[in-house]
């Protein structure tokens, strides 16, 4: 449980209870995002369990869902409504609903409750060939993909990537994959 960057504790918590349309997920892997270590961003909401780049196994599915126990999945922590003007114009990240969705608690735990709105459009089935660790890169790669789509990265266009951390490396690989050139990265 996160209290501050210098105060992280292992605590026992009750198993989350789910309702209709919700999922109980056994977490197998959770990535560490840059936002997980920004203390100023978290300090007003402590204590909390961080982690939103999550892959795991469905332990239990609430009534009304097509998912089954034992399915391997990656989870999308913020989901848009897909109905508002922002969503309908391809700007899902500005949707009002997006910031109100999440899972309970975060991914740095053994089990989490995946709410109905998330379960309706935020579950990605994983093939057996993809490891849980690799699946934690789905969310950051989606951010990179969206950024490059907005920036107009395409074959034959020059690209400068400033910063070669995790997101920067993903940008490098994606830009190279689409054939951007010259491709220059700094760190």
Give residue ranges: language-model regions.
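NAD(P)H dinucleotide-binding glycine-rich loop of Rossmann-like/cofactor-binding domains
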Residues: 81-158, 162
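Conserved S-adenosyl-L-methionine
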Residues: 177-182
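Hydrophobic/small residue at the entry helix of a nucleotide-binding pocket
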Residues: 143, 167, 175
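Conserved acidic E/D residue at the C-terminus of a beta-strand in Rossmann-like folds
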Residues: 186-187
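Glycine-rich Rossmann-fold phosphate-binding loop(s) that bind the pyrophosphate
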Residues: 61, 140, 163-169
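Short Gly/Pro-enriched turn/cap motifs at secondary-structure boundaries
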Residues: 3, 14-15, 46-51, 100-106, ...
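Glycine-rich beta-strand-centered segment in the early N-terminal region that forms part
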Residues: 14-30, 42-85, 127-129
């Amino acid at each position: 449980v996160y209290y501050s960057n210098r105060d992280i504790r292992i605590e026992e918590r009750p198993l989350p209870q789910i309702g209709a349309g919700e999922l109980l997920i056994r977490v197998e892997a959770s990535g560490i995002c840059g936002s997980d270590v920004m203390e100023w961003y978290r300090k007003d909401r402590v204590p909390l369990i961080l982690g939103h780049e999550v892959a795991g196994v469905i332990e239990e599915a609430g009534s009304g869902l097509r998912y089954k126990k034992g399915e391997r999945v990656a989870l999308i922590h913020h989901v848009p409504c897909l109905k508002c003007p922002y969503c309908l114009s391809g700007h899902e990240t500005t949707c009002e609903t997006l910031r109100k969705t999440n899972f309970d608690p975060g991914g740095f735990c053994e089990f989490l409750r995946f709410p109905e709105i998330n379960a309706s459009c935020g579950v990605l089935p994983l093939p057996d060939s993809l490891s849980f660790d690799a699946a934690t890169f789905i969310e950051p790669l989606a951010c990179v993909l969206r950024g490059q789509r907005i920036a107009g990265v395409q074959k034959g266009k020059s690209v400068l990537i400033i910063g070669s951390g995790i997101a920067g490396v993903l940008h490098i690989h994606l830009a190279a994959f689409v054939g951007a050139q010259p491709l220059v990265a700094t760190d």
